């Protein structure tokens, strides 16, 4: 299946499959310092266009909570084929259970 990816920043990490498995890791497009109890939208700096009748999922890795103390507030983000416009940048809504620093590219 062909997926069209638009990168909105030259510093955004390019998408690639993980070494073992079928998933693709997303990475923060900029640095974030999130205080305990705060909500943030982690911007991945990309737009993805998939074929009609397909969807993309944004889900946390098992290490996301362990490493950062972040919980994805919507559980699973579903991006359907219509969310592919110029301003439809993929983001992950998170809640911080402790102060954390997410570096660009992580």
Show which residues each predicted segment covers.
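DUTPase catalytic domain/fold
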Residues: 1-106
């Amino acid at each position: 299946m062909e997926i069209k990816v638009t990168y909105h920043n030259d510093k955004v990490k390019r998408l690639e499959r993980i070494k073992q498995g079928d998933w693709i890791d997303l990475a923060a497009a900029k640095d974030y310092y999130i205080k305990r109890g705060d909500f943030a939208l982690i911007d991945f700096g990309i737009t993805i266009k998939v074929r009609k009748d397909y969807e993309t999922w944004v889900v946390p890795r098992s290490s996301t909570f362990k490493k950062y103390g972040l919980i994805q507030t919507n559980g699973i983000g579903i991006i359907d084929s219509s969310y592919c416009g110029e301003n439809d940048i993929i983001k992950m809504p998170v809640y911080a259970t402790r102060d954390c620093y997410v570096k660009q590219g992580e």
